[in-house]
Regions:
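Loop/helix patches that line or flank the sugar-binding groove of alpha-linked glycan CAZymes
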Residues: 1-115, 120-127
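A residue-level detector for conformationally permissive "hinge/kink" positions
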Residues: 4, 8, 92, 137, ...
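A short acidic, often aromatic-flanked loop/helix-cap motif at beta-alpha or helix-coil junctions
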Residues: 41-42, 147-150, 163
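Short, polar loop/linker segments at the starts of domains and inter-domain junctions
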Residues: 44-51, 149-158
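Beta-strand-rich binding/interaction modules
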Residues: 124-146
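C-terminal beta-strand-rich structural cap/linker in extracellular carbohydrate-active enzymes
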Residues: 151-171
Length: 171
């Protein structure tokens, strides 16, 4: 969702719904009824065999009420796409930080530049001096994910499983 273009979300993905095609030549197990959480009782498609007991991530209703849920995370990412038009419309250039676990993009759009960085490590924080990179952005606009980020002078620290958006000013 933090890339250019028009993202596609398959329904249920935003709440972590599970399903599998298996060996059957049908999509019935991937087109299960949406788990809204209200009193409605939608039925799964005919011929579906995926056990409802494996749907362990909750419903739309329960995830909307839960801070930090997958659905709230998706809502935040969509909000960021709307707040920063450069994300869906900009020109992307890869940023090489010399790390297999941290990287990202410079995004240019209508004279402004954002930098979107991701630390995909599960346990190792990432630190870089932005003065040693081609990243012109020096202000943290957004922190997304599991941890924190900080910018002390030009030294950026990014926690594991965390992304951020850098810019020169708020949109």
């Amino acid at each position: 969702l933090l890339c250019s273009g028009s993202p596609f979300l398959y329904y249920g993905e935003e709440i972590g719904m599970k399903g599998v095609r298996g060996s059957a030549n049908t999509d019935a197990n991937r087109r299960l009824a949406m788990l809204w959480g209200d009193d409605s009782s939608p039925r799964d498609p005919e011929d579906s065999t995926y056990p409802s007991s494996k749907q362990t991530n909750g419903t739309v209703e329960s995830q909307l009420a839960q801070e930090g849920s997958l659905l709230r995370y998706y809502c935040r990412l969509i909000s960021l796409r709307n707040r920063y038009p450069a994300i869906p419309r900009g020109t992307y250039t890869q940023v090489n930080l010399g790390s297999a676990k941290c990287g990202g993009f410079l995004v240019e759009y209508e004279g402004s530049t954002l930098c979107i960085l991701h630390n995909i490590s599960t346990d190792i924080p990432f630190t870089v001096d932005l003065a040693d990179t081609d990243i012109p952005c020096r202000s943290i606009l957004e922190v997304i994910g599991m941890g924190e980020a900080s910018l002390e002078g030009t030294v950026l620290s990014l926690a594991p499983q965390t992304s951020l958006i850098l810019g020169s000013a708020a949109p």
